[in-house]
């Protein structure tokens, strides 16, 4: 049988599995109505359907050599969306197919492609940028992130990646980030994290449902407002209860724009500065986007075990402290002290005499001048020489990776913005940073 015939039979098999699952749901539904509470013993019909599909599917017992060849060719041929959905479908057939797909399909850092949902929290490619665009809906206070499928700037089609919804509180603003385009809430299973600002819109904290790699049990950085949710009896066991600070974004005060364009700094608590060095990498990349559901009792035990100091961590303070005071404390343990986070700063634009405006080279990806436009590069950090209080810091040597633009964001039309990112940022981190540019800044404009 030719490869084209195998792929055609494979796609037909997906259709038969869908029809079989639909028939099974109907039969289970009628059976549940007849037997009363017997149907309610299962959380969903999917729990019953999965083992049936694995046992009856003719694709489950495919020889590993043939399966490897089929998925390898399919992964190479279906390199772009929407055709890449067939690669995702292969990972949904059974466990053996899923394991083979995980072995063949590489992360975006290596292959430069976004395939599975976990790719949204994995670093982007090192040698190129992943081009995306953000659509803003002012009436609904929502933002949607799409993967560019065409080099054209003003296009309506794209692969949906993430969404966010703005909620204004009395003293702060929150942006809920989700994988669902419509149901954007913290109570949904698609909730990934959030962005929170202070009253002036000058300081932001990015929260993730998964802890950063340098977080220990004695120094967890959690959301202070989540304490009441931890002790509530209405906590859903399917909703990730952790809320960990992975990044801090600061805009320097610039009343009436007297100091020129906006100036911002980003402290990436989950990314070490060593990731930009030769041979460096981002540690502890997630293998699963959302942790597996656990029991309600386990969720209470894991949350109550957090130390009291985790809720009172000073990095959550939105007082008028300086930017340098928002870094990692020297009182932390040796492991955390050795973890020096990556700091990003915006690339300073140049003044154009003829146009009478500040300009940045976006290489054609931004066409409309806006105060929201920015480019982020790695900040050169001083390195201490020797040990002890008398050690004098020395300037770190310039490295080509530190001069590359890691994230750029800009306006191309009404409620349309481009977002391009690369290693070591992930799509989730880049989207959260760009959301901070949308927020109103009373003391920066």
From Swiss-Prot:
Entry comment describing in which tissues the protein is expressed: Ubiquitous.
Known pathway: Protein modification; protein ubiquitination
InterPro entries named among the record's database cross-references: F-box-like_dom_sf, F-box_dom, Tubby-like_C, Tubby_C, Tubby_C_CS
Compositional bias annotation for Low complexity: 382-398
Subcellular location: Nucleus
Keywords: Nucleus, Ubl conjugation pathway
Residue ranges of every copy of the F-box domain listed in the record: 57-112
Signal peptide coordinates: none
GO cellular component, one term: plastid
Family, as annotated: Belongs to the TUB family.
Full protein name: Tubby-like F-box protein 10
Naturally occurring in which organism (per UniProt): Arabidopsis thaliana
Lineage of source species: Eukaryota, Viridiplantae, Streptophyta, Embryophyta, Tracheophyta
